[in-house]
Amino acid sequence: MAVLFTIHSDLRYEIVRKVFEGGMGIIYEAEQHGARNFVKRVAIKVIRQSYANQKQFIENFIGEAKLVADLIHTNIVQTYHLGEAKGIYYIAMELIRGVNLEQFADQLRDKQRVLPPELAVFIASRVCRGLAYAHAKLDKDGKPLGIVHRDVSFKNIMIAFEGDVKLMDFGIAKAKGFLIDNEGEVVAGKADYMSPEQANFQITDRRSDIFSVGVVLANLLLGRNIFKGLNAEESRKNVMTLPLPDFRKLDPRIDDRLNEILHRTLARDLAKRYPDADEVLHDLEHYIYHSGYGPTNETLGKMIRELFGLNTKLAAADAKGSTRLLERAARSTQTLKAKDAAGAASSTRVTRSIKVRPK
């Protein structure tokens, strides 16, 4: 496409606070400033200093930004810009004023609340909407990109205070021509959310993400991850070998149809698993809307604001008010004891793993 003209602009970001610090990167809340006092709140993601000089991490970071830049969907966190400052690459992204599913689940547990099955299914259906879009994405020549997220998990699913469900972090996704891919040689992902083919050093396709959606849905319904072991290696083995339960016996709220959906998403035999996210989405939405009315973003948003003790009017306030909401939510989710948090980390993560296939 011919270029009509070029606009040169110096973007300026002012970092407001640290939102999250993970093993590989840090996410900040920032203000993007423009002409005539224009201000937009964004999230800024940077590589941790200890990894900033490692070529593979840098290339994957850049690849993630390029890949997600054109994934514009209401259920995927949007990427605005890839930049470099003083030799450090950063990604400017949509700022989600809300919590991830891990924080959400912790708060449910703390408040001794149970998530209604219909809302659990609603959340999973929105994740499937985002995945269906990503899986179907084509390159500029009209050829499938073959995107597989490979890290669908509680920490990578956000719920905004308004009730929007957002899939984030394509940092270990695979796609043709975008990211360094040594699949089959290393295990990448969270051990108790990855698919059996991931856990077994096999090549994955979009059905791998469907298995992970099944883990997310089961976790939301039961309040626990059935594959979680004492450590990452045990979790990985559970994903490959643990017999699937009759979910109806674990929770009487799970009926025959929902039990069937869970077993089909979690099928180890790829021929028996759902072939694509669209088909999962169809069954999930039929489950919650077959009677004519079911959960909405507003339903979920109301629950999450009540759960975190957030004033509805404040949730719709200006940027500063929304920042206070984030801070209050963060404080209310700091309920795990240090030893529990450490145990959770050790038992779930082969995250962005460098676990090499045995020779």
Q: Which residue stretches match the model-derived regions?
A:
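AlphaC helix of the eukaryotic protein kinase fold
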Residues: 48-70
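Activation-segment/catalytic-loop signature of the eukaryotic protein kinase fold
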Residues: 82
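C-terminal lobe helix-coil module of Hanks-type protein kinase domains
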Residues: 192-336, 356
